[in-house]
Each structure stands twice: as C-alpha cells, then as structure tokens.
Amino acid sequence: MILVNVHAGNCDNTLRNFKKKLQRELYFRKMKEQRYYETPSAKRVRKAQEAARRQRKFARKKMFDE
C-alpha cells in the first residue's frame, strides 16, 4: 500500500510524489504485463530479451567509461 502525505493542500506535488512512488514500485509495468495472459514460453523469451538488452546497455556504458 502506497501512502503519500498532503501538506497544506498542495495537490500538484502530492500527485507528482504519488506517480514517482508508483513507478518505483513497478506498478505500471505490472499492470501492463497483466493486461493479457502471457504463456510461460513467451515470458521466458521476453525475460531473455530483456536480459540481453541490459547486457548490451551495460557493455556500452562500460566501453564509454574507459
């Protein structure tokens, strides 16, 4: 459960903080993934692709840092 404090009726900052907390908790990603049923084999393929993408990103970052 996500709690957000409202200070002096400041709704704009409260809404911004609420959205940040939702993103940190990966709430939007979970909603998107659960919108449709994903077969276990498709889930494995997707996770492997995500891992490969992270590896490439890390390799690029490491190459530019050196």
Curated annotation (Swiss-Prot):
- Answer whether the UniProt record assigns the keyword Ribosomal protein to this protein: yes
Protein name, as recorded: Small ribosomal subunit protein bS21
Which residue positions does the secretion signal occupy? none
Q: Which Pfam families match?
A: Ribosomal_S21
Q: Which UniProt keywords apply?
A: Ribonucleoprotein, Ribosomal protein
Q: Which NCBIfam families does the entry mention?
A: S21p (TIGR00030)
Please give the organism.
Answer: Rickettsia akari (strain Hartford)
Question: Which BP terms from GO are recorded?
Answer: translation
The GO terms describing molecular function are: structural constituent of ribosome
Task: Please give the family membership noted in the entry.
Answer: Belongs to the bacterial ribosomal protein bS21 family.
Q: Which GO terms describe its cellular component?
A: ribonucleoprotein complex; ribosome
Q: Which domain of life is it from?
A: Bacteria
The membrane-spanning stretches of this chain are none
Does the keyword section mention Metal-binding? no
User: Mind telling me which InterPro entries this protein's record contains?
Assistant: Ribosomal_bS21 (IPR001911), Ribosomal_bS21_sf (IPR038380)
